[in-house]
Amino acid sequence: METITISEVPKHVGETVKIGVWLTDKRSSGKIAFLQLRDGTGFFQGIIRKNDVSEEKFDSAKHDLHQETSFWVTGEIAEDKRSKFGYEIHIKDFDIVGESEDYPIGNKEHGIDFLLDNRHLWLRSRKPWALMRIRSRVKLATMEFFEKHGFTQFDAPELTGSAPEGTTELFETDYFDRSAFLSQSGQLYAEAGAMALGRVYTMGPTFRAEKSKTRRHLMEFWMIEPEMAWMHQDESLKIQEQYIAYLVQDLIDHCARELEMVGRSVESLKPFTELPYPRITYKEAIEILQKGGFDVEYGADFGSPEETYLADQFQKPVFILNYPKEIKAFYMPEDPEDSRQVICADLLAPEGYGEIIGGSERSYDYEYITNKLEENGLSKEDYGWYDDLRKYGSIPHSGFGMGLERFLAWITLQDHIRETIPFPRMLNRLNP
C-alpha cells in the first residue's frame, strides 16, 4: 500500500492508499460520517461508513476526531464529480497521531486581532494556505523569469553600517563597538553586482521603521530589486512589464485553484498579461488629476487617492514617467529635456492598489553623484564605495524594485498586505 499526499490523489483512483491528514471539519448522518481533510498539499473529503469499520472506530470518528486532530487515514480513492474537490477517500481505517482539544479558531467569524494573535494557527486555514502557496509560486516564477533573461541572483547584506542624515526610518542595533542598521534596500549593493555580473537581482527582506498603520505598509517586507548594466529607461520598462506579465500568466497556469480560494478570478487577470502597458509622464498625470478634480500642482507627490484615480483611467498597470527630482532619490539622473525632473518611473497597479514598482536610470556621472552625496549628508566614509562605482569604468545602468507583498495584495485582491506574508510585522505587532 502506497503512502501519498492529497495532491497525488487523482493518480490513484481505485487504489487503497495511506495519507497523513488533519481534520478541518466533520458532520455525521446516521451510519455515515463526512470528514473534511487537509495535508498541506490540498483539501478533500473522507467518508466513513459504519459497515466499513469496526464499531469502535466509527464511534471514535464521531467523538475523538476534533478540528485539527492529526491522523493517518487508510482507504480507497474514488472520483466524485459532484464534490467541489473532485475526489474523496472511502476510509477503511485511521490512527490518531496528535489530539486537538479546544482548537481556538473555529468556523465562526473571528476579529482580525484575534486571528493575528493566533497567526501560527490561522495559517492552516484555507485562505492563508492559498495565499502562502501563491507567494511561494511568485518567488519561484521570479527566479525563472530572471534566469531566462540572463540575470544572476545576487545577495545584498541585511546589515549596513551607515544611516542617511536625518532619516528616522531605520532600525538600529548594536554591532560590537558601533551601530548597525537593518537594510531598507539592496539596490546600492546590487549596482555593484551589476558592474561585475551585468544583470543581477536581489530578493529578500527589507526593513522600514515607518510609523504607519496604512493597509500598504509593513515594518518588514520583501523586495525584488534588479539592476542592469548598459541599460536605459526604455529597455528597463520593457523588462518590468514583461516581468509582471510573466508572473500573472504563471499564476494563471499554476495557481488557478488558489486564486479562486482567495476570490480572484483567472479571467480578471488575463488583461494584465497584455503588453505593452500604458505610459504617461508625470506632467500628463498632473493634468489628468486636475481634470478629475484633484487639487494638485507640479511638484506634488502622489498618495493613494491620486494613484488609484490614475490607474483607474487605464484599467491595467500604467507607468508614470519622470517625476520632479525633489521627490525622488539622489542617484537618479536629471532628465535632459527638463532639468527639474529625473529619469525614473513608477508602475501603478489598477483596482486601488497603487505603486508596485519604482525604478530609474542610475546616474553614472562621478561628479554628479559626489555632489548629491554631499547634498544629502551622506559621508564619503560610508558611501565612498558607492562613489567608486562611477570612478572606475562607469556605464549607463538602470534598476527597479518591486514590493512582493504589494504585488501579492493586488493579484489576490487583499484589503491589507499583512495577509500576504506569513508573520506580518506591523507598528503594534511583533509576535508571533
Curated annotation (Swiss-Prot):
Keyword Aminoacyl-tRNA synthetase in record: yes
SUPFAM superfamilies for this protein: Class II aaRS and biotin synthetases, Nucleic acid-binding proteins
Keywords, in A-Z order: Aminoacyl-tRNA synthetase, ATP-binding, Cytoplasm, Ligase, Nucleotide-binding, Protein biosynthesis
Highest taxon, organism lineage: Bacteria
Enzyme Commission code(s) on record: 6.1.1.22
Reaction equation(s) it catalyzes: tRNA(Asn) + L-asparagine + ATP = L-asparaginyl-tRNA(Asn) + AMP + diphosphate + H(+)
The protein's name: Asparagine--tRNA ligase
Organism: Limosilactobacillus reuteri (strain DSM 20016) (Lactobacillus reuteri)
